[in-house]
């Protein structure tokens, strides 16, 4: 997915109140913008870091700039939590994830469960309806290991329970972790930061929920799917090795 119009480079001054950040543009102008990420963003808020912003016009917008990318640990990392849904939908629609391919319809943000919305609903007259929950991942503590969540997420545990309900009802239920960085070659659930989520994850696996981890190639010009990676979890560590992304390279 290309960034159009092009992103604006800047230097991060501070991220605060979860939804706001201050930055210095290359012109020297200091701006305040919107941070579309409610997580802790551990390791991704260092003052002085090189960042990239999208720019939006509109009389109803309070802030013109949106925090999209940051340079951290020698790589470019996506922080906008809306991007993984778009990347996943694009990859599935193009047939780049073989096990989620061949569906005639890919719909986004459909009502289901307990007053929730499923990120992607895949339907086809000849196939089982598939519910896909997408989670944004950018947390890395160990080299090469992507982890989720980076803080306690009650909503995340609820989503796993609802996916389990769909599996119990005879549908396919999929948790797709989209990793907005290219320097990770494996994924695991971060149980030490959220034991409730880790427990819900194990329960979802036993109920038949499928789990995949898709890493992305991120640059200031575009975000593209770069391959499915193994999951460090008993019983599913090799799950993703069967499937390839056609755009991988």
From Swiss-Prot:
GO MF term list: DNA binding
InterPro entries: SfsA, SfsA_C, SfsA_N
Family: Belongs to the SfsA family.
PANTHER family on file: SUGAR FERMENTATION STIMULATION PROTEIN A
Name this protein carries in UniProt: Sugar fermentation stimulation protein homolog
